[in-house]
Amino acid sequence: MAGIRIAISGVGNCASSLIQGLEYYKKISHSDNLVPGLMHNSLGGYLISDIKPVAAFDIDMRKVGTDLSKAIFSEPNCTKKFSDVPDLGVEVMKGQVLDGVAPHMTDYFRVDEKQKPVDVAAILKRTKADILINYLPVGSEEAVKYYASQALEAGCAFINCIPVFIASNKQWADKFRKARLPIIGDDIKSLVGATIVHRALTQMIVERGAKIDSTYQLNIGGNTDFRNMTDQARLKSKKISKTESVASQIPYDAYVYAGPNGCIDCLNDNKICHLKIDFKLFGDVPAYIDLKLSVEDSPNSAGVVVDAIRVAKIALDRKLGGPIIPASAYFMKHPPEQIHDAVAREKLEEFIKGTVQ
């Protein structure tokens, strides 16, 4: 079975955790033994060790021109190091800046205008990349569309991990469908993150016959993702993605708020979520759930992306194009179609086995 050749746009904390994870889990076999952090040891016959980075793009002068193994630990990245990564022989290349750097982030993302952007599609073709994984900052509307277009031009599948709506946008979905290239998106759900926990609790309350009156989810962190989202203009799509992901699980009108709420530098890549759900029980007796969740944000994301990569490769092998609905529904906050998580998981397993497309 051929390997999976991946390219990455945006070598930030999430990319760091993904690349570290490829090294950390490289000896995991086809065994069914539980491995912490993995939903599938083997997925469609593909192991973590089959995933090979072949190209990477960034705009920060501290990363451009360096080997990917070093760039993932360069500032402003601040996620935990859990694996040593050997030299990968993959040079980080300068991508197009476009709207990828918000005005308030110029001290955090350092652009050297003397470094010239490369032809991304040409690099993807030259390196024979199968899949382009998008990790650009939230709010990078034009930059994300640019990379999506480069994936199309190069004949790559596209995994969109941020809330710029590509897979869930009909025009873009049709472009990938017409090109017979798979896309999984939009906006990654973490393994055990705020959104998946919030969805699980709302699903349970609804199914048990209680009535949700209101619910909110507050999140703080200290990485560049949270710093970037202190600009309300960059935050719009993220709030839509998170709020709709939760609201879609409640089959009636209820007040729902979910979104990032501030950056505290000392937290680094630690994200702290506080969520509350007010609901009524038998006899309209009120009750509430008040919960705190603390996670290292980027490894939590990478645990899902390693499966999204393998599903995208299966879709490529089957010559499927357009949004892969079961994967998008299970892995992403803002898929083209919202599906109950338990149902989405069943459909995903059927897709992996090849019983549904």
Regions found by a protein language model. Give the residues of each.
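A short glycine/serine-rich beta->alpha loop
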Residues: 3-5, 184-187, 291-296
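Active-site-lining helix/loop region of Rossmann-like oxidoreductase modules
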Residues: 9, 49, 63, 71-77, ...
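Gly/Ser/Thr-rich loops at beta-strand to alpha-helix junctions
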Residues: 10-16, 137-142, 162-168, 189-195, ...
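Rossmann-fold NAD(P)-binding glycine/threonine-rich loop
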Residues: 137-153, 161-182
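Short catalytic-loop micro-motif centered on adjacent basic/acidic residues
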Residues: 132-134, 158-161, 184-187, 214-215
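N-terminal glycine-/serine-/threonine-rich beta1-alpha1-beta2 phosphate-ribose binding loop
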Residues: 1-147, 229, 234-238, 282
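Rossmann-fold dehydrogenase core element
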Residues: 175-188, 209, 213
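NAD(P)-dependent Rossmann-like dehydrogenase/reductase catalytic/cofactor-binding core
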Residues: 303-357
